[in-house]
Amino acid sequence: ERKKSFEARLLEVNRLPAVTLDGVGVALLANIEKADETGLVTQYFGEGVGLYRTEFLYLNSARVPTEQEQYLDYRKVVEELAPRPVVIRTLDLGGDKPMAGNAELFPKESNPFMGFRAIRWCLENVAFFKDQLRAILMASAHGKVRLMYPMISGAEELARANAVLEECRQEL
C-alpha cells in the first residue's frame, strides 16, 4: 500500500520542473540496463539517460554480443529517446560482474572490485573494446550520445582508452 501511495504521488509531481529551492534547474537522467527500459524514461518524464550500463548485454547473454547486435541495441535506445541525451558507459565487467562462460578472462584477485575490471579489462581485451566502441560510434549518428569509461584510475588509462576510441573512429 505504501508503494502504491508513493507511486501515485510520484506521478503527480514528475511533471513538475526539477528545480532547487534557489532556482537552479536539475536534469533528471535515468539509469538503465536494457534497451527496453526506455519507455520508463519517457513515462516518468526523464530528460535522458545518465548511465546506460552496457555490461548487461554481456551478462544477460550466453555468448558475447557481436558489434552489430550492440549497435542495434544502442541505436534503439538513442532513437527512442531522441533528442534526449544518452550516456553510454563502456563495459564494467569484472569484480562483481564476470562474464558468464568466460571466467578464464577474469583472474582471481584479492580485491576484484579495485583490480582487473572495467577499463583495465577493456584495455587488455582490445578486440571486445573496439567492437563496443565502434557500435557506440555508429549509434551516435542517430542521436545525442555521450561516452563514459568506468573505473579510470589515472591519466594514462584515459589516454589509452581515447587512443583506442580514435582508432575506431578512423576505422569507420
Spans of features found by a protein language model:
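Conserved glycine-bearing catalytic or ligand-binding loops at nucleotide- and phosphate-handling centers
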Residues: 1
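Conserved alpha/beta-domain cores
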Residues: 6-172
